[in-house]
Amino acid sequence: MKISLIVAQLRAYCPAFSGRVSAGIDWDAVANSAQLSHPSAYVIAAGDDASANDVDNAVRQDITDLFDVVLVLNSTDERGQEAADLLHDLRANLWKALVGWRPSVEYDPIEYGGGSLIFISRARVVYRFSFEAAFQLGRNRASEPAETWEEWKLDGLPAFEGMDVDVDFIEPSDPNLQTPGPDGRIDAQFSVDLPQP
């Protein structure tokens, strides 16, 4: 999933951050480079999970994209009591901005996955909230764009325009055969032309 879409959604619908939302693929790298005022939010691409292929003649998998929203708050005490109350309010804002929202048409609505403390000190609290959204890899209709190598390869084949059929009937009473079965002589022929869209 494009995390820039998540950043834009949080900037638009979480006024508590006053636009202080950034993103990256690794929390340590983001924490060392993005120095925003607090409270601030950082969207981190956390990976994806894939189900097994569920069809025999194609590729179709359910993929769940995972991302974290890491909040960084100022803390006035080592216990984080005041920060815990603020985290409760900010979590509600994150839910309003993200849960049920579809980042693009191929995704199911975003779901909340839970939260956990990353770091606390006398000056700062860092807390992670996890979210996920699922989509299907592999198209449902041939008219949709190819998403896998197999679909791309099949799209390159010529259209199935028709077929020619030769029929050799089984003739178990033919005295020329030692065993019953087809004799190798074509008994009927026909062609089928298929209409093209």
Model segments located where?
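Intrinsically disordered, low-complexity acidic/polar segments
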Residues: 52, 78, 138-142
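Acidic-leaning, charged glycine-interspersed low-complexity segments
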Residues: 40-42, 85-150, 156-179
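Sterically constrained small-residue positions within well-ordered secondary structures
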Residues: 34, 58-60, 120-122
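Small/polar-rich, solvent-exposed N-terminal microdomains that initiate assembly or binding
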Residues: 1-57, 81-88, 156-197
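Extracellular/virion structural assembly segments
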Residues: 3, 58-64, 72-102
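Oligomerization/assembly interface segments of phage tail-like spikes and tubes
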Residues: 60-77, 124-137
